[in-house]
């Protein structure tokens, strides 16, 4: 069953088309990430789902109930949708307990029990209840914002780049905790982000947005290993794209003959490998390697190697894990793991 269905959503500001025929389904209890560069339309789409913006056309269904189709519109406060903005947007004049309890109905004791349960749910120490927002860390503020959104028992949770202001280590830990919490609460969620690794690690379903359109929607691993086109491939991570000649499930390219993911394709094509699919080893000094390192850019854990292939003279640039012995002039071997992906067309 789908919690959310979008059919043909479009939006323009004056003569500028921001969204073009967006179709998307979000399964009950699942996590979806909408990822794209700045200006791709992802925040506009989130605001339309929330009810803050009205689309020019299309239909939104929330648990089968029509939210709007351009002529009629259910306002944001009647949709039962939780929203966590980028900065948390906590009420500065309310304590942690006041923020979480804002909008809760019932008597004082009942509200207190609910606030304590929500704080426990988002792993906030009860001793923080009397603190003010400015006394909290960034991660704690985001947990308070999430607890406040969950207090209304939403049918859908929208997260607008909620981790972007956090430090790198805290961002990963908070993201993991929020994902686990939403799964336990069985609340479907949509995360909007420009961070590819964040989208891939958070979601069950990733939607890549480009120029107001959804370029590809699917499981994170499918999009990463089998992107629909070269722009999507490079947006989701480092790539090595090669021209090749295909025949019977194999490709002849600058790396030699390697397996590909479509045995039916033949003739010229462009193929893609991810850097982690290429194992680079140092050759025996007495033997000639498959390639020679002509340049290296060391960046700590990862180094970028400029290679010249011995057999063809082709120049390649490949990222690999840094290690001793990788230096200009060194002879190396290359071993391709798995299959290369063939781009359509």
UniProtKB/Swiss-Prot annotation:
Gene Ontology cellular-component terms listed: ATP-binding cassette (ABC) transporter complex
Membrane-protein topology: Peripheral membrane protein
Subunit structure: The complex is composed of two ATP-binding proteins (FbpC), two transmembrane proteins (FbpB) and a solute-binding protein (FbpA).
Record domain ABC transporter: where: 4-236
Residues spanning the signal sequence: none
Pfam family, one: ABC_tran
Main location: membrane
One Gene Ontology molecular-function label: ATP hydrolysis activity
Location in the cell: Cell inner membrane
Coiled-coil intervals: none
Reactions the enzyme catalyzes: Fe(3+)(out) + ATP + H2O = Fe(3+)(in) + ADP + phosphate + H(+)
Transmembrane segments: none
Cysteine pairs bridged by disulfides in the record: none
Binding site for ATP: 36-43
Function: Part of the ABC transporter complex FbpABC involved in Fe(3+) ions import. Responsible for energy coupling to the transport system.
Protein family membership: Belongs to the ABC transporter superfamily. Fe(3+) ion importer (TC 3.A.1.10) family.
Keywords of the record: ATP-binding, Cell inner membrane, Cell membrane, Ion transport, Iron, Iron transport, Membrane, Nucleotide-binding, Translocase, Transport
Protein name per UniProt: Fe(3+) ions import ATP-binding protein FbpC
Entry's EC annotation: 7.2.2.7
Top EC class, one word: translocase
């Amino acid at each position: 069953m789908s919690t959310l269905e979008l059919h043909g959503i479009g939006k323009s500001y004056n003569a500028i088309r921001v969204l073009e025929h967006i179709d998307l389904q979000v399964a009950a209890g699942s996590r979806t990430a909408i990822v794209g560069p700045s200006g791709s339309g992802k925040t506009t789409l989130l605001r339309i789902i929330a009810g803050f913006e009205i689309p020019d056309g299309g239909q939104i269904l929330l648990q089968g109930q029509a939210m709007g189709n351009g002529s009629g519109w259910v306002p944001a406060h009647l949709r039962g949708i939780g929203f966590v903005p980028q900065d948390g947007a906590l009420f500065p004049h309310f304590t942690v307990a006041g923020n979480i309890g804002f909008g809760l109905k019932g008597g004082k004791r009942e509200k207190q029990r609910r606030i304590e349960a929500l704080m426990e749910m988002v792993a906030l120490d009860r001793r923080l209840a009397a603190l003010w927002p400015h006394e909290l860390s960034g991660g704690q503020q985001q947990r308070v914002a999430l607890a406040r959104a969950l207090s209304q028992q939403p049918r859908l949770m929208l997260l607008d780049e909620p981790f972007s202001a956090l430090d790198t280590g805290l961002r990963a830990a908070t993201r993991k905790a929020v994902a686990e919490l939403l799964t336990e609460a069985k609340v479907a969620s949509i995360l909007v982000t420009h961070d590819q690794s964040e989208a891939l690690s958070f979601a069950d379903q990733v939607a890549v947005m480009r120029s107001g359109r959804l370029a590809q929607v699917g499981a994170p691993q499918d999009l990463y290993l089998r992107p629909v086109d070269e722009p999507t491939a490079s947006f989701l991570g480092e790539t090595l794209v090669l021209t090749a000649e295909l025949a019977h499930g194999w490709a002849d390219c600058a790396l030699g003959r390697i397996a590909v993911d479509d045995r039916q394709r033949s003739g010229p094509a462009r193929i893609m490998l991810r850097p982690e699919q290429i194992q680079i080893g140092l050759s025996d000094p007495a033997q000639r390697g498959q390639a020679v390192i002509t340049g290296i850019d060391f960046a700590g854990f990862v180094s970028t190697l400029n290679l010249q292939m011995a057999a063809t003279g082709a120049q390649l640039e490949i990222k690999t894990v840094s290690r001793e012995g990788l230096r200009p002039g060194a002879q190396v071997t290359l071993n391709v793991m798995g299959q290369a992906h063939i781009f359509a067309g």
